[in-house]
A protein has these predicted regions:
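A short alpha-helix-loop-beta-strand transition element characteristic
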Residues: 73-75, 82, 118-125, 173
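Short beta-alpha connecting loops at secondary-structure transitions
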Residues: 42-47, 100-103, 256-266
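N-terminal glycine/serine-rich phosphate-binding loop of ATP-dependent small-molecule kinases
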Residues: 1-98, 178, 194-195, 199-204
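Short beta-strand-loop/turn "lid" adjacent to the catalytic site in phosphate-handling enzymes
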Residues: 68-105, 132-155, 177-182, 186
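Glycine-rich phosphate-binding loops at beta-strand->alpha-helix junctions
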Residues: 16-17, 181-189, 209, 234-235
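Active-site core segments that coordinate phosphate-bearing ligands/cofactors
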Residues: 2-3, 8-10, 111-140, 150-170, ...
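Gly-rich Lys/Arg/Thr-decorated short loops/hinges at beta-loop-alpha junctions or inter-strand turns
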Residues: 38-47, 141-148, 169-176
Length: 309
């Protein structure tokens, strides 16, 4: 029987939670699932690690919630897009599993090249590189998620061919994943990943970009006199650009969701909207349970109270 309607999956792996959303081909949300990440391991200033295999575990939980709410034939899902948080570091063993906890973008160790002090480490990559492997078994990643201490050439969107650059960043080419541009197929969902997540095996996993670039595209940040203020865990502003500006003083150049296009991004506020979550949690689980039982949320209650301030 021919499948009439077709659907896509969007995966958004953030700093605080993971969301998996199923859309129809016109962009309407059909259903979704969300899973909170565990509190980060932050034993001292400058250290911020995602505990255990939390990024993947949250994807499994969010995916199962979304697919559990999907009432159509799973065979009607024809592909998925993968987007994760940027500026993180994942160190993988030869089999693609984590050699150590993922360093979150708030970890100050990311300001320095990877020291290669763990003999288990075979690949050094981003969160999207790691999650791509978990879904597809491939050692590939989107070029547009390599912001920070990486030997990437932002003009070509490939690894630098300059040996001195590779030495500066202390990552030999053999320890880096192969890069593809946003919109390219990274691989296909394996039977193992399908069994864990409920996402149909064999559908293509498509590269997107870093989370801020995906947000910019989704918000309609296109050429013209338009700016975007991104209200995430990290708060920042950005505008569209068409060339890699290397000597900017008051912003940095981030790779966009469109190949060979850029975003000029301001400095920002670290732990910006995370502070909202922190403030909410000060009121305790009892409040959250009580308001959720009434069909609302702690955030909505706080919004209502804020009107009286």
């Amino acid at each position: 029987m021919k499948v009439k309607n077709k659907y896509l999956i969007g995966l958004d792996g953030g700093t605080q939670s993971t969301k998996v959303i199923i859309f129809d081909l016109e962009g309407h949300v059909v259903c979704q699932g969300k899973a909170q990440l565990k509190p980060m391991y932050m034993p001292r200033p400058g250290v911020a690690e995602h505990p255990d295999d939390d990024l993947w575990d949250s994807i499994v939980a969010a995916s199962r919630k979304a697919l559990g709410r999907f009432t159509e034939d799973p065979a009607s899902i024809i592909g998925m897009g993968l987007c994760t948080i940027r500026c993180c570091r994942a160190c993988l063993k030869a089999d693609g599993h984590l050699a150590s906890p993922v360093l979150n973008w708030m970890d100050l160790r990311l300001a320095s090249p990877y020291p290669f002090d763990d003999p288990q480490v075979r690949y050094v990559t981003t969160t999207s590189g790691y999650i791509t492997h978990r879904f597809t078994g491939e050692f590939r990643d989107t070029a547009a998620n390599y912001e920070g201490m990486w030997p990437i050439d932002k003009d070509t969107w490939q690894w630098s061919g300059d040996q001195k650059v590779l030495e500066t960043f202390n990552v030999p080419r053999k320890n880096l994943l192969d890069l593809v541009n946003p919109g390219s197929i990274l691989g296909y969902v394996t039977d193992d990943a399908s069994e864990q997540t409920g996402i149909p095996a064999g559908i293509p996993v498509v590269a997107t970009a870093n989370d801020k670039a995906v947000e910019a595209l989704g918000a309609g940040l296109l050429p013209g006199s338009i700016g975007l203020v991104s209200l995430g865990t990290y708060i920042g502003g950005m505008v569209y650009g068409e060339r890699n500006i290397k000597d900017a003083q008051f912003f940095f150049t981030n790779m966009a969701s469109i190949p060979n296009r850029y975003l000029y991004e301001s400095g920002g506020i670290r732990q910006g909207m995370w502070t909202v979550s922190w403030f909410r949690d000060l009121f305790g689980k009892e409040l959250a349970d009580a308001v959720c039982a009434e069909g609302t949320s702690p955030e909505e209650v706080l919004n209502q109270e804020a009107w009286h301030v």
